[in-house]
Amino acid sequence: MSHRNKENMKLIKQIIPIAIIITLMISCASSRIVLSSNADVSKYKYVIFGSESSGDRELDDVTMAVQNQIAETNLKVLSASDISKVLECSDSILTPNIHVTSEKWDGGHTYITVTFYDYNNNQRIAVVKSSGIGMTVSHDQNIALGAIRKELDKLFKDN
């Protein structure tokens, strides 16, 4: 191997760790939960999904992924058509509004906001938010989904 090739290899070995660090720094997530001041989240045991989403219809796959994450918490999914169960449990049912936006260029953001309402009185109980920024739109979405999952787990897994 020539002297020039050895120098090039040495340079490449120095650049790769820097590139990895930059890539990791570019990928980030943020999330938070805001609760209504008088809300007792522990009383809620059920969730009813309906047509409670908003945002770009092209992001329905992300909306469905959020809905699936909610269904994986300790909240039991009820059907609005199961009238007897709904009437019996109405004071412990939440219904979510899921809003997803995604900037359509690489390096943009994906934002997910889930607002949980009391099924009886339509009052806001909790708002769970996340955002993700990565190298591609798909990466942004996966980061935001991971962040929202952590917040949903915090809010409902011990419920």
Regions found by a protein language model. Give the residues of each.
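A structural "domain/chain start" motif
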Residues: 3, 26-75, 158-159
